[in-house]
Amino acid sequence: VTSVRLVTFNIHHGVGDDRRHDLARIAGVLAAADPDVVCLQEVDRTFGPRSEGVDQAELLARALDRELVWASAIEEPRRDGPAKRYGNALLTRLPVANDAAHRLPGHGEPRAAVRADLVVAGGALTVVATHLSSDSARSRAAQAEALVGLLPPPGRAAVVAGDLNCGASATELTPLRGRLDDGWSRAGARRDQARRWQVWKRDLGLTHPARRPRLRIDLVWVSPEVRVTGAAVLDGSRCSDHHPLQVDLDV
């Protein structure tokens, strides 16, 4: 059995509720959690002024000393420099056996997923990190179906993680529920944000908006081969508009 700590975090291109871009705050939250695998959404790579033109994926991979696997949702070439990229980053300290970037179907803002087969004791753990459509349940349904197509055959350990822009019981996630279980519900122990104004909402896994969370849309789905020993909503309020979700897994 390999114990794996995974964190999924929509980092809002490093801009916090004070409207400041400060990637060091993101790195600090992640370093404190010390995850084996990090699934990041809304990551800029030399995108533009909103994130000071930096390669956020590379900087975070270096800061955390993790291997980077990437999938662009938006990629625009430039004549005078590196391409303008925005999408999903997977950072891992576990060895990567295979990885691939996948475009997802749907209308509106382009969406993507990154898939990595990670080496664990006695086999592999497939992790798919993604960010689904924010404005169309129909698009999310098509994207969920596509995610199922990225999973390994039944009987092999798999995780899907990211900002799915809908709750775990949403109709459009029916394809996922056919193969995977909601990790928060499966967790042996759960810890929510313990702010005083949120006392009546503890144990709900609310992650968005960070200032006063009312939605559980940052989700981790696990196959039956994966045991969820714990789950916690971390505090991302100073560095993003989402809180990170941490899950501890036995694979």
Residue positions per predicted region:
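Short, flexible/disordered intra-domain loops and linkers
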Residues: 45-55, 80-81
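Acidic beta-strand-to-loop metal/phosphate-binding motif
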Residues: 38-43
